[in-house]
Amino acid sequence: MTYVLFTLSVMLVMGFVGFSSKPSPIYGGLALVVSGVVGCMIILNYGGAYLGLVMFLIYLGGMMVVFGYTAAMAIEEYPETWGSGFEVLACFLVGLMMEVGLVLWVLDFDEVVVMVGFNDMGNWVVFEGEGSGLVRSDSIGAGALYDYGRWLVVVAGWTLFVGVYVVIEITRGN
């Protein structure tokens, strides 16, 4: 299981480095979608079935629609891949070397500090009629988002509305 997680982590880093090395929008979108799929697999590996499914359906579904539309609008006759030019290949290799250097630098410190700790199981216990039971943390996360993070949902909805309004105003024309 450790090898699977290590392989998925390497694929995730390579996907994001491949996206950030600025190839053609078609290949950049492909790298981002592949990185999203690998991220879903990492979440599933940690036991987050609900969160992995939500991320796969909503996040990747939306990304495929957006990247399909933008790739159709920015189509090139000869799209630039990661190996077609020296600059893009150099950016990709430098990004990978920096990522490996960062991992080696972090591994040099012998400890990892946990910033958030859940020491109380009271948040995850459900009290029913005569007994009590536990709820999985990923399925209660959606309820916690709308309960404790309702301001975040409002801000995210308002941001999406303003973004759509700005795009409509820009593309409307006179």
Curated annotation (Swiss-Prot):
Name by which UniProt lists this protein: NADH-ubiquinone oxidoreductase chain 6
GO cellular component: mitochondrial inner membrane
Keyword terms: Electron transport, Membrane, Mitochondrion, Mitochondrion inner membrane, NAD, Respiratory chain, Translocase, Transmembrane, Transmembrane helix, Transport, Ubiquinone
Its job: Core subunit of the mitochondrial membrane respiratory chain NADH dehydrogenase (Complex I) which catalyzes electron transfer from NADH through the respiratory chain, using ubiquinone as an electron acceptor. Essential for the catalytic activity and assembly of complex I.
Family listed: Belongs to the complex I subunit 6 family.
PANTHER family attached to this UniProt entry: NADH UBIQUINONE OXIDOREDUCTASE SUBUNIT ND6 (PTHR11435), NADH-UBIQUINONE OXIDOREDUCTASE CHAIN 6 (PTHR11435:SF1)
GO molecular function: NADH dehydrogenase (ubiquinone) activity
Transmembrane segments: 1-21, 24-44, 47-67, 86-106, 151-171
Alphabetical list of InterPro entries matching this protein: ComplexI_Subunit6, NADH_UbQ/plastoQ_OxRdtase_su6
Matches recorded under Pfam families: Oxidored_q3
Species this chain originates from: Papio hamadryas
Localisation per UniProt entry: Mitochondrion inner membrane
Lineage: Eukaryota, Metazoa, Chordata, Craniata, Vertebrata
Keyword Transmembrane tagged: yes
